[in-house]
Regions:
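Carbohydrate transferase catalytic cores enriched for Leloir-type hexosyltransferases
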Residues: 1-369
């Protein structure tokens, strides 16, 4: 039996990001697999103090609970002794403070080191140093897309032999609204006779929210945009644009919402618009498809890998192309029907159980070295 330590710090985030969702779902799925490995869940105390909700996954059988234990980073003499664990898996693109016998890191995106100004200079400097060290030290590097793998090959010293691509999973909704219920829910949100364009993700420069707003300005008045997500880098300019252009009556800024409310918003939407300029995976694309919503996404970065033939793609730098495609999806009932059907089929190809099984194979591969 081997002991595998995982940096589970992001599982206790009160407003889970993509990394937090990945961390939670991977750990929960690992708990459901048959394996002799023991998993050590590790937390940075500064994060743990925020919330104590997710400390240990709920195992499917009592016998599995013994395979999970917890260490806080406040106990360096008991946690950081490298021989305590046979393998360390960083789920958050950063290395542990001390070296382990074997290390794996999952990398989602590397935009801070590609020259794009999608974050502050201070963040880019700190992130770049941590990422480069993590990749250099790792025995294997897991990415969620071929796009990120190719970026790592281009911008770091990682070799192709170290890379393993494991796409993320998606949960099918626990409750699905009937078409009439979806329409009523949409009318409650944006008014009778109006169409609801949903945008899910942090409101920031990288998510291309400004061009989504510019596209909205060229669409009929009855088209409304609902933004779901907290504020990020560049959000001030986005909020100022909404005020300056007088879009307050057509744009709802809902901030972060819990999972149950998010599913309801997906199922109320006419379309998901996801024109992100840089994306390592793009989980909202699959989430929308799983909830029976057609998707219009940027035809760049990893998004075509995720959406496949089930989504329609646009030039994210061209607001008119975005607007034309959104209107086509909303106005063409037969196209919508086909996209929803293809989207549901596409979403079923991705599961967290498959993510856990593929990750476990990487663990076994590294442990055998």
């Amino acid at each position: 039996m081997s002991t595998i330590a995982l940096d589970a710090t992001y599982t206790v985030e009160p407003q889970p990001s993509g990394i937090a969702v990945y961390s939670r779902k991977l750990i929960e799925a690992l708990a459901g697999l048959e394996t002799s490995h023991h998993f050590l869940l590790c937390y940075r105390l500064s994060r743990l103090a925020r919330r104590r909700e997710f400390l240990r996954p709920a195992p499917k059988a009592d016998a599995q609970e013994s395979r999970f234990s917890i260490r806080l980073f406040q106990e360096p003499l008991t946690f950081w002794l490298p021989w305590q664990s046979d393998l360390f898996h960083s789920l958050a693109q950063r290395p542990p403070a001390f070296r382990f016998k074997r290390e794996i890191v999952t990398v989602f995106d590397i935009f801070p080191i590609t020259g794009h100004e999608y974050s502050s200079p201070d963040f880019r400097r700190k992130f770049s140093a941590l990422l480069l060290e993590a990749v250099e030290r790792a025995t294997r590097v897991i990415t969620a897309s071929r796009y990120t793998a190719e970026q790592l090959l281009a911008y770091t010293s990682v070799s192709d032999s170290k890379l393993r691509i494991i796409p993320l999973g998606v949960d099918l909704p626990s409750l699905t609204l009937a078409p009439v219920e979806r329409l009523l829910a949409r009318e409650r949100l944006v008014g009778e006779g109006n169409e609801m364009i949903l945008s899910v993700g942090v409101i920031q420069t990288r998510k291309n929210t400004l061009n989504a707003l510019r596209a909205l300005e060229t669409l009929p008045e009855r088209y409304r945009l609902v933004l779901v997500g907290g504020d990020g880098y560049g959000s001030e300019a986005i909020h100022e644009y909404i005020r300056r252009q007088g879009l307050g009556s057509r744009v709802q800024v809902r901030g972060y919402v819990a999972l149950g409310e998010l599913q309801a918003l997906y199922q109320s939407a006419s379309v998901l618009l996801f024109p992100s300029l840089e994306e390592g995976f793009g989980l909202p694309v699959l989430e929308a498809m799983a909830n029976g919503v057609p998707v219009v996404a940027a035809g760049t970065a990893s998004l075509p890998e995720v959406g496949g033939e089930a989504a329609l793609y646009v030039d994210p730098h061209d607001p008119r192309d975005i607007a034309r495609t959104v209107q086509l999806v909303i106005e063409d009932a037969e196209l919508r029907r086909k996209m929803i059907e293809r989207g549901l089929k596409r979403a079923r190809e991705f599961s967290w159980e498959r993510v856990a099984e593929a990750t476990l194979k990487v663990y076994d591969e590294v442990l055998s070295l």
